[in-house]
Curated annotation (Swiss-Prot):
One of its GO terms (biological process) is positive regulation of seed germination. Keywords: Glycosyltransferase, Transferase. Possesses low quercetin 3-O-glucosyltransferase activity in vitro. GO terms for molecular function: abscisic acid glucosyltransferase activity; quercetin 3-O-glucosyltransferase activity. This is UDP-glycosyltransferase 71C5. The gene is UGT71C5.
Length: 480
């Protein structure tokens, strides 16, 4: 039987890799005509361990192979990453195009000349940052599909920006932060200040507009979300409107739990044993992603809030981007002693396992989309504290559009030139967390309901399973 091979080109960052690999596994499990998923792994300078992550995540899946690309000799200057991360990433991918082109051409040539007993390349699945590779797809006569690791809301912004650029050909400025925008994928008007911080930078804004423009050239767009969690935006994209077909295939999650060499086995067991001893829904989990670093004064305010509330907690503190600092070092003197027995402070926490535990009752999160979907899957309500990328938009959508989260902040920014200098006070944090942990808060009931809906979406006959099967039918056509 003639079988298909699909080539994936992800952005080699943790959040993008996790959902990309899980989606590849789902395709292999859904249709036996797909026999191979080939992942082309670029060597991103600020994510040097991507290959190791890929290897561990795919070790048990023989249908996935990794092709590691060599380092490029002239990467973009690292200082560009601090001022315009979107531009850095697009420039990095552009510099990888010659190697990507040669690798894809070789894979297609090899499959075409191998006869009927081997798999044949059926198409490209590209991270949304990799839209420039659509040109390579055309060159080798393959359809290109975009995989949105984020949600419909962010796709709606990418659809909106090129139209805005035609009317107002410049980036947003600080004075437009309070401006409320009509973005067709949203029910409510969207404050400019919750858009990705890059829209306020000339280079980043241009990069986001370029991505939005090129999305039109894709054969289709796969979105890591599900119709029932973003119904208005999903309906908007289902209407076509001279746009590629959009497939809601989420939630695409790695729920096996993830280990980290920084957390010894004994520490993990101790943490889970402590959770086992706590009452149901009584523990607050605070975790801000792999890049979520707060200044010391803000850590002090969070600590004071936890003492004001008096609730049980697990708090993952990163003191630097490497995550190798002492999490207790920036804490107020005596905090660890005063909260002994009712709180755990660590540098890394097994997020999936904690959210899955019945003792966990609330999640203070940076609102990365993977984290949001994990919290919905396990029915744990979120208090929003966005940090970077599109997290401010995710926070706005969860609080204002969907009523699925409690607001600490919607527009907090922790990177680039728009970093938030204001310190969020202990009182403000405590007020939001008390609301979050209130068993009568209607947000909690809605989130628990979405947990059931999310599981149905990816179950047999669920909306996302049907959408994924439709995608498979479209990309394979009548050739397999």
């Amino acid at each position: 039987m003639k079988t298909a091979e699909l080539i994936f080109v992800p952005l080699p960052e943790t959040g993008h890799l996790l959902s990309t690999i899980e989606f590849g596994k789902r395709l292999l499990n859904l249709d036996r005509r797909i026999s191979m998923i080939t992942i082309l792994s670029m060597n991103l300078p600020y994510a040097p361990h991507a290959d190791a992550s890929l290897a561990s995540l795919t070790a048990s899946e023989p249908g996935i192979r990794i092709i590691s690309l060599p380092e490029i000799h002239d990467p973009p200057p690292i200082k560009l990453l601090d001022t315009s991360s979107e531009t850095y990433i697009l420039d990095f991918i552009h510099k990888n195009i010659p190697c990507l082109r040669k690798t894809i051409q070789d894979l297609v040539s090899s499959s075409s000349s191998s006869g009927g007993g081997s798999s044949h390349v059926a198409g490209l699945i590209l991270d949304f940052f990799c839209v420039g590779l659509i040109d390579i797809g055309r060159e080798v006569n393959l359809p290109s599909y975009i995989f949105m690791t984020s949600n419909f809301g962010f796709l709606g912004v990418l659809q909106y920006l090129p139209e805005r650029q035609r009317l107002t050909p410049s980036e947003f400025d600080e004075s437009s932060g309070e401006e409320e925008l009509h973005i067709p994928a949203f029910v409510n008007r969207v404050p400019a200040k919750v858009l990705p911080p890059g829209v306020f930078d000339k280079l980043s804004y241009g990069s986001l507009v370029k991505i939005g423009e090129r999305l039109h050239e894709a054969k289709g767009i796969l979105v890591n979300s599900f119709t029932q969690v973003e119904p208005y935006a999903a309906e908007h994209f289902s209407q076509g409107r001279d746009y590629p077909h959009v497939y809601p295939v989420g939630p695409v999650l790695n729920l096996t739990g993830r280990t980290n060499p920084g957390l010894a086995s004994a520490q993990y067991k101790e943490m889970m044993k402590w959770l086992d001893e706590q009452p149901d829904s009584s523990v607050l989990f605070l975790c801000f992603g792999s890049m979520g670093v707060f200044p010391a004064p803000q850590i002090t305010e969070i600590a004071h809030a936890l003492e004001l509330i008096g609730c049980r907690f697990i708090w993952a503190i990163r003191t630097n981007m490497a995550g190798d600092g002492d999490p207790q070092e920036p804490l107020p003197e005596g905090f660890v002693d005063r909260t002994m027995g009712r709180g755990i402070v660590c540098s890394w926490a097994p997020q999936v396992d904690i959210l899955a535990h019945k003792a966990t009752g609330g999640f203070v999160s940076h609102c990365g989309w993977n984290s949001v979907q994990e919290s919905l899957w396990y029915g744990v309500p979120i208090a929003t504290w966005p940090m970077y990328a599109e997290q401010q938009l995710n926070a706005f959508e969860m609080v204002k559009e969907l009523g699925l989260a409690v607001e600490i902040r919607l527009d907090y920014v922790a990177d680039g030139d728009r970093v938030t200098l204001e310190i969020v006070s202990a009182d403000e944090i405590a007020t939001a967390v008390r609301s979050l942990m209130d068993s009568d808060n209607p947000v909690r009931k809605k989130v628990i309901e979405k947990s059931s809906v999310a599981r149905k979406a990816v179950g047999d006959g669920g909306s996302s399973t049907v959408a994924t099967c439709n995608f498979i039918k479209d990309i394979l056509g009548d050739h397999f």
